[in-house]
């Protein structure tokens, strides 16, 4: 699958753009703040129904306008064209369509356009809270397992309802254990398969991740990702029962898969505490390349790969290795941003495969062709 054409209207700093892409490598060059990353974010939007960088859809509307629109024509491995479009107005909810047919649930679109983004913000995966690491593992699995995504959405819905019930108990100064157990049963129902699939995913993911870390880092360091969960020791039902008193007085569900975490290790040392800046950069890039490979093996066709400002992450030699790697036939369509035209041109001239370069300036996009 590849993105053939992308049209933007009032998306972030871009008033209007119409781009036709190479099936292999596409590069956006321009100064910082020109809008290169915004183009990658628009592509990401078409895959995940949301921005990679902002949490509120309306924040993506160009200043002074009242809507944005993104339209992408994707060519499938069967040589069929699928048009994905998103329109967000100030006054209405987001409209998301595939071939002019609007989705009833945005979750039905997830996995249709497999895609992996590598961004300087990925270091937050190491240094920030556990919610980002859960989002990572959930995002990878959801791209090839719609049942997992459905269970996860239902778990979060029931969790919110259980927390609301706990708050009502506290506010009304009464407690009904039987009523709470109804929510517990549903949490157990959804939590157990999610936990099991997270475990299975990491078991299969680790050898792929180690392979890419070796390539990116150029070292023989051993990396590991440890899945931390209270469900390792006790079933979800027992955890909820033992935490009932604490939950009652905190008005919050203190145990469950929503508290799970991933611990990142290099040679048995936590990357967050002891990893150098170079090790952290190599770690997150390798994680994302392994995500590409893992999803490719699972779904049978190549995800689109977005490389945002990779020179911020790696030194020039590592970047040259990375561009050469993603330029081979195993990888599919790739989008790259850089601030230096001469640098990216040199890298592209030293690999096989067709490519296209776009100049970006103040939200305006111009192709070499």
Please provide the spans of the model-predicted regions:
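Conserved P-loop NTP-binding catalytic core
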Residues: 11, 15-96, 155, 170, ...
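Walker B catalytic acidic pair
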Residues: 308-310
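Structural recognition of the conserved hydrophobic beta-strand(s) that form the central parallel beta-sheet
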Residues: 72, 333-340
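An accessory alpha-helical subdomain
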Residues: 118, 124-217, 228
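Nucleotide-state sensing region of NTPase/ATPase domains
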Residues: 48-132, 141-144, 148, 206, ...
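Conserved NTPase motor "head" modules and their coupling/switch loops across ABC/AAA+ ATPases, GTPases
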Residues: 1-31, 174-304, 313, 317, ...
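Hydrophobic "anchor" residues on beta-strands that sit immediately upstream
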Residues: 37, 95, 115, 304-305
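Conserved short hydrophobic beta-strand within the ABC ATPase nucleotide-binding domain
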Residues: 43, 357-358
